Amino acid sequence: VTDGRAGEAPGAGTGTDLARSAARGAATTTAARAVRIVVQIAGLVVLARLLTPEDYGLVAIVGTLAGVAELLRDFGLSNAAIQAPVVTAAQRSNLHWVNLGLGVLFAGAMVALAEPIADAFGNRDLVGVVRWMAVVVVLNSWATQYRAALSRDLRFTALATLEIVSLVVGTALAVVLAWQGWGYWALVAMQLLTAAVMCVGSTLQGGWWPQRFRRGVPLRSFLRFGSQVFAAQLLGYASRNVDTIVAGLRFGVPASGLYNRAFQLMAMPITQLTYPAGKVALPVLSRLQDDDARFERYLLRGQTVLLHALLPIVALVCALPEQIIDIALGPTWSQAAPILQILALGAFFEAANFSPSWVLQATGATGMLLRYTLVAKPLMIVLIVAGSQLGLEGIALGYAVGAALTWPLGLLWVRRVRAATARHLFLNGAVAVSGHIAIAACVAGVVRVLAPDSAWTALVVGAGTLAVVTALLALVWPAWRRGVLSLLWTVQLARARAGRPAR
């Protein structure tokens, strides 16, 4: 690498150019996530019929613990690199070595703690799983700054391609191994191959090689920003994953697997849509943080498009949990249906709570984000632990109540940065959330009255009911109509730009 300013952010350009770039980026990443959802659902449908709740429970518990190591090895530095106005080649290389060093350190800690972890959950199979998952942490740590650079340069197509290819080959391997009777090792192998493909692919796509670590290269601003983001992410991660650990500790590894499959089934569409939305929103909004009018316009449009794309899926899951479980996991997982429905209720509010974090990160208000997280996430954890007194459904209820409470809390912190923006975010989100909850109630009512004779028929009836009620709301509710039209406008703009070469 010879370009001393290789990581300088692209210019914002004109409003139309940025709108098209954002729309194209959103379309590319959303389309990729749609493909990911299809692949993940296909893998889920097959693997759930080949593996047991205990198999899933083992990998879910270790995956949750490995996720902590993943956050530690990232330390918020990927977000720091994306958000910074300029990243020199030397800074990028130093950040790479910092991430890799942290990855090796915490992977080593996982290996050392494998025996105590297995003892805590009373299952010796966890020892091998923990040690192999540590390799995944190292592979991901190498790829951290390569992926950040691709995102920073708005190379969304390259990122999307890598994510799809890695997932497809990993899922294919897992299905083959599960079919041959490898049990939970099929899931471990999937994680390893997915990480390896992403590691190699991002390095090749990046087109640069890290220089040696140089002393004196300024990293303080990255470390300060990253540490605040990391603290917020760590608490957020704990609040989202403590339920799996609590389920395993209190009710055993199979119960943890049952709960985790319900949670992942609900989290899958949320993650696959909010992750690319955030990857597009953060660099775009960061470039607009000094232009209040354009910042708010892009923010509200992004929130609207995200909610109107995501919440119809949540509404169907909330209305038809038994049918969704039967189709996705099979009848042997029927006990997960009430858990799934409760989690879906919380997902309405969780989806609305992503845009406040965009505001705080894009404007550099990471201290504010940390203070919000220090209040909201411990609240979520307390509710989940308290709910565990009522069983697995109680854990899900604690999560749902926490999601409903933390949405307005997030807006209170945004209000300290941009008061008008917080108000508009709330009104915008309230329209989408309330409308889709009403749609879910209508879908559940129609399916209950018609009583279809199969899960697939019920899903078709539910989807048709959702479409009809959505159209009726657009006719009688102007705010709802504007949201639907905004989604359609974004899709149309993205299609208009689809013929242009991607960066």
Task: For every predicted segment, state its role.
Residues V1-I41, D74, N79-I82, V86-W97, ...:
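N-terminal membrane topogenesis motif
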Residues T2-G13, L412, A420-A422, A441-R503:
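Membrane-proximal transmembrane or re-entrant/amphipathic helices at the cytosolic face
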Residues T2-L18, A22, T157, V200-N241, ...:
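Interhelical loop/hinge segments that connect adjacent transmembrane helices in multipass membrane
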Residues D3-A6, D17-F75, G101-P116, R131-V136, ...:
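Signature of the first transmembrane helix
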Residues G25-Q40, L187-M190, T194, M198, ...:
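Transmembrane helical elements of multi-pass membrane transporters/channels
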Residues A80-A89, L139-L162, W185, G206, ...:
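Membrane-interface junctions at transmembrane-helix termini in multi-pass inner-membrane proteins
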Residues Q83-N99, L258-L374:
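Specific pore-lining/lateral-gate transmembrane helices of multi-pass inner-membrane transport
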Residues V127-A134, L162-W208, R224-F225, R261, ...:
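Hydrophobic alpha-helical transmembrane segments
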